[in-house]
């Protein structure tokens, strides 16, 4: 090596964490989450994951409620999870307005999840652009407990925390993760098609596939999201534009009238939500498992 030269290795740049879980914990502190759990049986895998999630939310300072119910009619099972009563009419509120909550977390009985996936939903619902952090400071004190001042007589301070302010106009009231269906290729989120494309697509919606969704890097809007792993902010079901029954199956009739399709209960909800002005956001990074039984 020539004289006068010295080789210095450059320290590798530190990778910024993909998710700020400490922020997510701060966002749920003092908030109430109600688990909406349709179905009548779960696996031990589900049970262990659910107990851990409950523990972690409480440890982070959040509150939890469980609303579980069952009906052979899935649309009615979901309504029952919201405490619906057919005698209260179309303008009724979830749980008759008597249950305080900030978010509903819908989890189907065959979903495999963990606490990280929940925090990721929170960070999708309250994105970075909706958050303003304000530093909280306090004077630095000497060994005798006396506040230290600088040469101008001003207190020397240190940052001890942050106050978080949220711009509600930038919050996403309906957010979802995704999971594969039984074919192992089709996902639980989809986009609507016009009649011609719907027909050429074999009479099914334009579902994101395992290949297409893994090419996405940022949250995106969808026309439909399955309710297996879905977070809904308070105010959506309370909206006067979202009357009961919230999951009533619909007949989707295309323009010509020659093609029509019966929608499932979750598709019907998404149709109503979009008509009421809500966007449905999916983050392609939030993938949960989907437990299915296979005979071999």
Residue ranges with predicted function:
Residues 2-72:
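N-proximal low-complexity "stem/linker" segments adjacent to membrane-targeting elements
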Residues 39, 57, 65, 99, ...:
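Cationic, hydrophobic amphipathic alpha-helical membrane-interacting segments
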Residues 49-52, 80, 120-121, 268:
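Alpha-helical elements of Rossmann-like donor-binding domains used by nucleotide-donor carbohydrate transfer enzymes
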Residues 74-97, 119, 271:
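Short, conserved alpha-helix that lines the donor NDP-sugar binding/gating region
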Residues 92-114:
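Short beta-strand-to-loop acidic/aromatic patch adjacent to the donor-nucleotide binding site
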Residues 99-101, 170-172, 278:
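Short, high-confidence coil segments that cap the C-terminus of an alpha-helix
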Residues 114-251:
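Conserved catalytic core of nucleotide-sugar-dependent glycosyltransferases
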Residues 246, 253-263, 267-290, 296:
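Catalytic donor-sugar/metal-binding loop of nucleotide-sugar-dependent glycosyltransferases
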């Amino acid at each position: 090596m020539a004289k006068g030269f010295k080789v210095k290795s450059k320290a590798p740049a530190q990778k910024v964490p993909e998710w700020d879980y400490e922020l997510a914990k701060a966002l749920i502190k003092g908030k109430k989450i109600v688990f909406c759990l349709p179905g009548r049986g779960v696996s031990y895998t589900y049970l262990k994951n659910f107990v851990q999630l409950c523990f972690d939310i409480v440890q982070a300072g959040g509150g939890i409620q469980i609303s579980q119910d069952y009906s052979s009619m899935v649309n009615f099972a979901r309504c029952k999870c919201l405490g619906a009563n057919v005698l209260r009419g179309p303008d009724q509120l979830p749980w008759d307005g008597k249950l305080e909550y900030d978010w509903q977390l819908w989890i189907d009985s065959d979903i495999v999840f963990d606490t990280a996936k929940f925090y990721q939903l929170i960070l999708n619902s309250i994105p970075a652009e909706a958050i303003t952090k304000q530093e909280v400071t306090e004077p630095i004190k000497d060994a005798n407990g006396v506040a230290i001042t600088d040469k101008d007589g001003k207190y020397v301070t240190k940052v001890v925390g942050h106050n978080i302010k949220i711009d509600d106009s930038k919050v996403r009231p309906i957010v979802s993760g995704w999971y594969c269906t039984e074919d192992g290729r089709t996902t639980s989120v989809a986009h609507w098609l016009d009649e011609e494309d719907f027909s050429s697509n074999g009479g099914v919606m334009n579902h994101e596939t395992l290949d297409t969704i893994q090419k996405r890097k940022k949250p995106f809007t969808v026309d439909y999201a399955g309710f297996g792993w879905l977070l809904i902010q308070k105010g959506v079901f309370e909206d006067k534009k979202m009357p009961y029954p919230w999951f009533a199956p619909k007949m989707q009739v295309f323009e010509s009238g020659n093609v029509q399709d019966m929608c499932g209960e979750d598709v019907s909800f998404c149709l109503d939500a979009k008509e009421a002005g809500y966007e449905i956001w999916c983050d392609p990074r939030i993938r949960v498992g989907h437990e299915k039984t296979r005979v071999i």
